[in-house]
């Protein structure tokens, strides 16, 4: 707990985030020139697995062919930092409290809890798009894949039975095909082949989702990339193997410091992630080439993102799910030449979320869709200066890892977390970007803490299952505070929903 006094003094100068319109005024804002009578655009959505937001520098093809002619959102986030719920949110535009996929195990998790009868695929398919998925769908899909099940809305279906870079099985339009670990078997290359064939074989508008297993562990690189990044320096931010975790919640305090061998494993995995992204980078280029050769590229909206980030040892953690920056932040790049966006635009300070992707794509395609929790990004991309969110909810349900159920609210300046244990975290991201100082227990921070608690009460409704079971009072880790946050909604009063399929 270092520099708390300085953080507290600066924090009292600003209790709420700045007007987002002010952020936009300082951004490099793209302007759209798309005609309402233009042909519907093709849509390409590329979703990687466990890719951090700060890795795009290692993807030169993407930088040259997506970021340079397109728009980058440096402040893009997911609203539940875990593969299964995040992918459900990408396909529906909804929070976990709406689609009810909170984690990767049932109940409230896995494929059988996902209602796939209304998704981005069905919206576009019903509007005349030819749709295809290539890669990872929803965790737990393997139980349905072996029966030949193909979700509604997909015309071409080349999906992992279980996601892996080698030694995997794909279900191709309901038929199973196994792959080994030979030079032509790497999943990134196989999926790119299938995606390119889909572009070549399509007439009319298309929707293509390419969902790679990379750079998820085991991040096995494509053939020829095994020796790349040999000189990659270890990442050692101040939060790496955090020395003083006395102000962190119990789940962090119980994590032991890393051994030398663990640090070496973290560094090796990080290098493998970068190596595996080289194959993804080439896949991006191949899909763009196919679109260009087919005369489609100019009127194609290309979206590149990841399902969540991952921590490389920050706060002694090496996975995702945590409400910390490395876990919740993701890359987000878009290109649509026909829209006339200013090439190389960046929109810093615009809090773009994974729940915004489905309504953005539907808006671009001009197709009707049900109401969503997310909002279309197109008005921002077209230069409008209307109101935009100043903060957003993050929600997560305890699963296979020791992180308790939590709700959090993240703004441009603050991250506030409240766990089902009653523990709280509050970070001033301006003064403390590495989230080293939990100031929830600092008396001078009480006005900020109370304001953030009130905001969380507004956003975290309904609460995640089990959130209200363990504690009905808020107890900051460093200081007991009276009048803490109390969420009064009961499990019985929340909206209930049965899984679409029997588990297993």
Enumerate the language-model features and the residues they cover.
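Bacterial N-terminal signal peptides that target proteins for export
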Residues: 1-7
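Bacterial N-terminal signal peptides
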Residues: 7-19
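Formylglycine-dependent sulfatase
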Residues: 25, 29-419, 424, 433-451, ...
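Functionally engaged cysteine thiol sites
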Residues: 83-84, 459-464
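Short amphipathic alpha-helical coiled-coil/interface segments
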Residues: 449-456, 460
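Juxtamembrane/start-of-transmembrane alpha-helix segments at the extracytoplasmic/lumenal side
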Residues: 466-480
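Alpha-helical transmembrane segments
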Residues: 482-496
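Cytoplasmic C-terminal tails of single-pass
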Residues: 497-504
């Amino acid at each position: 707990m270092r520099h708390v006094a300085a953080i507290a003094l600066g924090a009292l100068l600003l209790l709420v985030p700045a007007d987002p319109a002010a952020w936009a005024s300082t951004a490099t804002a793209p302007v759209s020139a798309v005609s309402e009578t233009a042909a519907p655009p093709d849509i390409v959505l590329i979703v990687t697995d466990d890719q951090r937001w700060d890795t795009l520098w290692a993807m030169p093809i993407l930088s040259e062919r997506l970021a340079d002619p397109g728009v980058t959102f440096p402040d893009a986030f997911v609203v539940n930092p875990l593969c299964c719920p995040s992918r459900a949110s990408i396909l529906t535009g909804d929070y976990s409290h709406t689609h009810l996929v909170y984690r990767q195990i049932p109940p409230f998790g896995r494929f059988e809890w996902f209602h796939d009868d209304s998704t981005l695929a069905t919206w576009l398919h019903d509007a005349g798009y030819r749709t295809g998925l290539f890669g990872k769908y929803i965790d737990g899909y393997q139980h349905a894949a072996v029966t030949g099940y193909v979700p509604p809305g997909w015309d071409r279906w080349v999906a992992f039975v279980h996601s892996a870079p080698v030694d995997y099985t794909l279900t191709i339009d309901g038929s199973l095909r196994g792959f080994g670990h030979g030079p032509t078997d790497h999943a990134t290359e196989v999926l790119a082949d299938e995606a390119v064939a889909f572009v070549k074989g399509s007439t009319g508008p298309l929707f293509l989702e390419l969902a790679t297993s990379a750079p998820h562990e085991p991040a096995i690189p494509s053939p020829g990339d095994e020796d790349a990044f040999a000189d990659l320096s270890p990442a050692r931010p101040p939060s790496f193997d955090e020395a003083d975790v006395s102000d962190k919640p119990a789940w962090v305090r119980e994590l032991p410091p890393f051994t030398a061998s663990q640090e070496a494993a973290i560094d090796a995995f990080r290098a493998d992630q970068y190596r595996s992204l080289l194959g993804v980078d080439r896949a991006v280029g191949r899909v763009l080439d196919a679109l260009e050769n087919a005369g489609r590229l100019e009127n194609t909206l290309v979206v590149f993102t990841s399902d969540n980030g991952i921590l490389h040892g920050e706060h002694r953690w090496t996975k995702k799910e945590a409400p910390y920056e490395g876990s919740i932040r993701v890359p987000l790049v878009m290109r649509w030449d026909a829209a006339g966006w200013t090439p190389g635009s960046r929109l810093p300070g615009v809090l773009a979320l994974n729940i915004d992707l489905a309504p953005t794509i539907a808006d671009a395609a001009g197709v009707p869709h049900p109401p969503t929790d997310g909002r279309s990004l197109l008005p921002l991309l077209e230069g409008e200066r209307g109101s935009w969110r100043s903060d957003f909810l993050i929600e997560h349900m305890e699963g296979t890892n020791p992180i308790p159920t939590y709700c959090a609210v993240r703004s441009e300046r603050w991250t506030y977390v409240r766990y089902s244990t009653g523990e709280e975290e509050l970070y001033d991201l301006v003064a403390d970007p590495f989230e080293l100082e939990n100031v929830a227990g600092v008396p001078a921070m009480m006005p900020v803490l109370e304001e953030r608690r009130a905001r969380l009460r507004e956003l975290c409704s309904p609460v995640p299952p089990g959130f209200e079971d363990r504690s009905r009072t808020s107890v900051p880790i460093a200081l007991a505070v009276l009048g803490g946050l109390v969420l009064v909604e009961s499990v019985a009063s929340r909206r209930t929903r049965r899984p679409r399929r029997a588990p297993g």
